[in-house]
């Protein structure tokens, strides 16, 4: 009997929330998956521990100042050690890699993802900013190189699963669910004084700091709307957000006959990660199962875009197109970092994003170089607005 060839997986951002959970999935299925490469930005100690445990072919630390420490710590192992942004982009092109999990945070994920697509690697996409910033470009590349993009976001994985077996059946509407975050019931007055400590307490999901703040401000949901447009080929008007505080229904698809398919489950990111790895197959897992006898109260409500303006700004950027979503992403990365440093208020983040949208040069059909220039200009303007 032939031995099953293990899928070789590269994890970009292995020390973050998604990356560490992906390693749990791999650990649970050592007969199916093998870690080929691990990368991190700064968390060198955790990267060292992961490398010693999973014995990848290579590791990359983006922060070059940490290279010597990483190299020394792994000197007794047959693991190649690299550092810097260029190495990050090159490692994804390695021949044996089957799947690249893009779990790094923010705009930094764009270039490595493009390189992985050009190298013909299946993309398990957890870095939503890649499609927010350059969705059209990424889709063109994926078509050109016949590379599958498998969504890892729980909402997009849910939609992806709902679309299984529906080839050729027109989508009427994609319905993305949102928990509403920790401030769902706060008044505008209360939102003026919320702190980063409060914002970092998400009611349902365990996530990294940046995405947790984005969830609190609903920018995360705005980005997911843009991501859905590119992943599923729907118009902005076909994407609806509904607040579902229990996070049991992960998203839904309504078809032209009015039928709605939904994907349900426990709020556990390992499930969509595993599905992206195993697609089109499903494999067993030890994850907690949903107990319907305990789901006695599933509720739904409309999002309030007056209190959570970021969602409206994301929709506006999607309707305007061009480099506008790139502008929003860059400004958002700057304001979230400032909020985490206590340099801007929670509501002030939306003000800076909106003003940045009005000041950065608009490009209707941007190239990759345009995106790079837009990102730099938007960050500069957002920082200037914060300092005013």
From Swiss-Prot:
Its EC number is 1.1.1.267. It comes from the Bacteria. Pfam families: DXP_redisom_C, DXP_reductoisom, DXPR_C. One of its GO terms (molecular function) is manganese ion binding. Its cofactor is Mg(2+); Mn(2+). It catalyses: 2-C-methyl-D-erythritol 4-phosphate + NADP(+) = 1-deoxy-D-xylulose 5-phosphate + NADPH + H(+). 1-deoxy-D-xylulose 5-phosphate binds at residues 128, 154-155, 179, 202, 215, 220-221, 224. Mn(2+) binds at residues 153, 155, 224. Keywords: Isoprene biosynthesis, Manganese, Metal-binding, NADP, Oxidoreductase. The keyword Zinc-finger does not apply. NADPH binds at residues 15-18, 127, 129, 208. Pathway: Isoprenoid biosynthesis; isopentenyl diphosphate biosynthesis via DXP pathway; isopentenyl diphosphate from 1-deoxy-D-xylulose 5-phosphate: step 1/6. The keyword Flavoprotein does not apply. One of its GO terms (biological process) is isopentenyl diphosphate biosynthetic process, methylerythritol 4-phosphate pathway involved in terpenoid biosynthetic process. Catalyzes the NADPH-dependent rearrangement and reduction of 1-deoxy-D-xylulose-5-phosphate (DXP) to 2-C-methyl-D-erythritol 4-phosphate (MEP). Belongs to the DXR family. PANTHER family: 1-DEOXY-D-XYLULOSE 5-PHOSPHATE REDUCTOISOMERASE, 1-DEOXY-D-XYLULOSE 5-PHOSPHATE REDUCTOISOMERASE, CHLOROPLASTIC. This is 1-deoxy-D-xylulose 5-phosphate reductoisomerase.
């Amino acid at each position: 009997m032939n031995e099953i060839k293990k899928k070789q997986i590269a994890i970009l951002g292995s020390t973050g929330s998604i990356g560490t959970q992906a390693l749990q999935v791999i650990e649970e299925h050592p007969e199916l998956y093998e870690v080929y490469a691990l990368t991190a930005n700064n968390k060198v100690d955790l990267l060292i521990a992961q490398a010693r445990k999973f014995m990848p072919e290579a590791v990359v630390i983006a922060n070059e100042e940490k290279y010597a420490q990483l190299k020394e710590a792994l000197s007794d192992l047959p693991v190649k050690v690299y550092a810097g942004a260029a190495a990050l982009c090159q490692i994804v092109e390695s021949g044996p890699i089957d799947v690249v999990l893009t779990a790094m945070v923010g705009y930094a994920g764009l270039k490595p993802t493009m390189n992985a697509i050009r190298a013909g690697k299946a993309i398990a996409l957890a870095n939503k900013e890649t499609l927010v910033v350059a969705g059209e470009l990424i889709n063109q590349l994926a078509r050109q190189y016949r590379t599958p993009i498998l969504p890892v976001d729980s909402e997009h994985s849910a939609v992806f699963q709902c679309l299984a077996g529906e080839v050729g059946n027109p989508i009427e509407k994609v319905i993305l669910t949102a928990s509403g975050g920790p401030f769902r019931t706060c008044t505008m007055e209360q939102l003026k004084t919320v702190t980063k400590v409060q914002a970092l307490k998400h009611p349902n999901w365990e996530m990294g700091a940046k995405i947790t703040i984005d969830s609190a401000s609903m920018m995360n949901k705005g980005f997911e709307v843009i991501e859905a447009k590119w992943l599923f080929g729907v118009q902005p008007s076909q994407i609806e957000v509904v607040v579902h505080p229990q996070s049991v229904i992960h998203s839904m698809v309504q078809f032209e006959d009015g039928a709605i398919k939904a994907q349900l489950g426990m709020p556990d990111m390992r499930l969509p990660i595993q599905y992206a790895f195993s697609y089109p197959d499903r494999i067993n897992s030890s994850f907690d199962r949903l107990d319907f006898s305990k789901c006695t109260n599933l509720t739904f409500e409309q999002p309030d875009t007056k209190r959570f303006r970021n969602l409206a700004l994301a929709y506006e950027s999607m309707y305007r197109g061009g480099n506008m979503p790139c502008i929003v992403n860059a400004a958002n990365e700057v304001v979230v970092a400032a909020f985490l440093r206590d340099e801007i208020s929670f509501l002030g983040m939306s003000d800076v994003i909106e003003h940045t949208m009005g000041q950065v040069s608009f490009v209707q059909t941007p190239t990759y170089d345009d995106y790079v220039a837009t990102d730099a200009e938007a960050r500069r303007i957002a920082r200037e607005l914060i300092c005013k």
